[in-house]
Design a protein with these regions (language model features):
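Conserved interdomain linker/interface between the two RecA-like ATPase lobes of SF2 helicase motors
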Residues: 123-192, 197
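Inter-Walker segment of RecA-like/P-loop motor cores
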Residues: 17-61
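Conserved helicase motor "Helicase C" RecA-like lobe of SF1/SF2 P-loop NTPases
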Residues: 188-215
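Post-DEXD/H (motif II) to motif III coupling segment of the RecA-like Helicase ATP-binding lobe
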Residues: 79-139
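Conserved Walker A/P-loop ATP-binding site and its immediately adjacent core
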Residues: 1-12, 21, 26, 186-192
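Conserved RecA-like ASCE ATPase "motif II neighborhood" in helicase/translocase motors
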Residues: 39-40, 48-88, 251-253
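Conserved RecA-like P-loop NTPase helicase motor core
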Residues: 80, 218-347
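Long, largely alpha-helical accessory region at the distal end of helicase-like NTP-driven motors
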Residues: 164-175, 180, 187, 324-351
């Protein structure tokens, strides 16, 4: 997903290039994972600049192809520190390498799989604190919204309880924007049961919302229609840019990192996320509204003067109904203080 998104963004800036995707996902460009094909593809286009998009999972295919790499661009680079991915990232050769992440992973002791391994990742060129990004009009600060409920949630009633919680949260939203809500589900089973065994879809439709959901197990759906991922993300971009469109986007993990989802105003955390995933989920809803972005760049409004903004913050809602959900709230509060008040990064360690 991220490879395809990056491809779309790069192509708008450098359209006169040849493009190859080295992963198993869908794409309209050439796609292959066999290293022999990669070698031949590069040799067939000597007169063109070339962009090759891959995943950390498939990076070793590029290494096996023995093609010469001028620039290595690694997005969400903390993912490269996992045991399965580090072999590729530590062996790939290029003239220049750049690693981007808002949530770095470091190593401790004798573990080499951390972004503090300068032999692999080099030295830090730049690190911009979140308060500075808020001040210069790049992002918004998040606003925590606590939703208290007396319902007792168990593994047996979780789909029904989550449905009630979501409907109550949405019912109480007060905003001048058309709500576009990202819901992080506890797991795929609970999400699927809630969508298929409760009336949440029809209830949301009655309130004027469209429903989108995507998981690696069941695929992508728009309302009750299954679609391929390209249609899903094209629709998501279209609806995200439409100020009159209201929708609820359900997911489990798949949209947490890196994926650019335009227009999101709220996120609901139905599960206690790891630190990096929690920070990445917050990142989905603190993007500027397109009007504010354009007005800042046109000098119509002042960067960082949130009172002038059309969208003033990204709302992060946490349902509180048990000791574990209180823990989620506390972890979220500490994380936001760490990032948006202290100006530190939300880091973790590679194990």
């Amino acid at each position: 997903l991220l490879a395809q998104q990056l491809c779309d963004e790069f192509i708008t800036e450098v359209p006169q290039v040849k493009v190859l995707h080295v992963h198993s996902g869908e794409t309209k460009y050439d796609r292959e994972t066999k290293h022999e094909f990669i070698t031949n593809w590069v040799s067939r286009h000597p007169q063109y600049d070339k962009l090759i998009f891959t995943t950390y999972h498939s990076l070793h295919k590029i290494c096996d192809s023995m093609v010469n790499i001028d620039v290595l661009y690694c997005d969400e680079a903390h993912n490269s520190t996992s045991k399965n991915h580090f072999v590729g990232i530590s062996t790939v050769k290029s003239n220049s390498s750049y690693f981007f992440t808002a949530t770095p992973k470091y190593s401790r002791g004798n573990n080499e799989r951390g972004m503090n391994n300068s032999d692999v990742y080099g030295n830090t060129l730049i690190s911009v604190p979140a308060p500075e990004l808020v001040k210069n009009g790049t992002i918004l600060a998040p606003l925590i919204d606590i939703h208290e409920t007396n319902e007792t949630r168990t593994k047996y009633n979780a789909p029904e309880i989550d449905k009630k919680v979501i409907l109550n949260i949405i019912k109480n939203i007060k905003t001048n924007l058309s709500p576009k809500i990202l819901v992080a589900a506890p797991n795929t089973t609970i999400l699927w049961n809630m969508l298929t065994k409760s009336n949440i879809i029809s209830s949301l439709k009655k309130q004027g919302y469209d429903i989108m959901h995507i998981t690696s197990k069941h695929g992508a759906y728009i309302n009750k229609t299954k679609v391929n991922r390209q249609v899903f993300f094209d629709t998501l971009k279209e609806w995200g840019d439409d100020d009159n469109r209201k929708f609820v986007l359900f997911h489990y993990s798949i949209l947490s990192e890196g994926i650019n989802v335009p227009g999101l105003t709220h996120t609901v955390l139905l599960r206690n996320l790891p630190i990096i995933e929690m920070a990445q989920t917050i990142g989905r809803v603190i993007r500027l509204h397109k009007y504010d972005y354009n007005n800042i760049h046109n000098n119509t409004i002042e960067a960082g003067n949130v009172k002038q903004y059309h969208k003033k913050h990204g709302v992060v809602t946490v349902p509180i109904n048990s000791k574990s959900s209180v823990a989620t709230r506390n972890r979220l509060q500490k994380l936001i203080e760490l990032i948006f008040e202290d100006g530190l990064t939300a880091h973790s360690f590679a194990y």
